Amino acid sequence: MKVLLGLLLGYSVLILTHELPDLSATQHPPKEELAYWCTYVKNCDFCWDCQNDICKNKITNESISINSIVNCRVTRDSIHQWCFYEISVKMPNHHNMECSLPRPYTGNEIFMEKWGGGDYWPIIIRHCCFYLVFSIAFVGYIVFAYHKNLHLNTTMKLLALLSILIWLSQPGLNRPLSIFYMKQNLPRTYTPPVRELEYWCTYGKHCHFCWECRHGICKNKVWDDMPFIKQNDYISQCSIARYFDRCMYFIKPKTPYIHYMDCSQPTAYEGFSHS
């Protein structure tokens, strides 16, 4: 471990003091950079030496099953000091890292390549048209109030009424989980609202927020027919988000990935592959 930390520290100093050349997309990084690249995602194929279905890590000497190894490519942009992993399991995903340290790059922890293309443009156009009409109505109301010399109290009441109508129209624009759920977007969070657990846990039965664990034994909060499991088995850290009519899982086992779903029901979102 001390040797590994020393290598990482030395390589970090090397990167900080010497601008490394661009590294075009390649299956295997240079051997002298393995200690750096293999720190963040240890299950990349170039970090392991496999014989007889048993793989030994080239840096830490750990051993794992060959089934845990995934194919990876690496890239470096020396101008912006960004280093990239491209990991392909069932669905490719990308990791951005600061080249100076093997950790996720701030603001770009993970992003997905979109398949199908352009399928959410009708939603964006619908929103733009709606807010354009709202803006015209708002300006028209201000002009109307000015010419009619309406009292400030009356003006504020009518503005409040207009705002309420706009708020109530959001479910029609965003197709939420149900007609009773009025929130437009669900920001990325690690725990969904309790009332939505059944929805989110239909697909992500392995997400940690679907389980209640005591003394190392976990019971599913939603599905009574799910057998008890050990706390360290099967459960993964998950976070969720809702964007327009699209719902997303951010699942982080050894290799993070995103799963897209229709917000109306927990089924795969058309046009996106999922793991």
Swiss-Prot record:
TM region(s), chain numbering: 5-25, 127-147, 149-169
Keyword flag Phosphoprotein: no
Superkingdom in the source lineage: Viruses
Keyword match GTP-binding: no
Glycosylation sites: N61
Membrane-related topology note: Multi-pass membrane protein
GO terms under cellular component: host cell membrane; membrane
Keywords tagged on the record: Glycoprotein, Host membrane, Membrane, Transmembrane, Transmembrane helix
Subcellular location: Host membrane
Function in brief: Plays a role in virus cell tropism, and may be required for efficient virus replication in macrophages.
Family according to the record: Belongs to the asfivirus MGF 110 family.
Protein name: Protein MGF 110-11L
Source organism of the structure: African swine fever virus (isolate Pig/Kenya/KEN-50/1950)
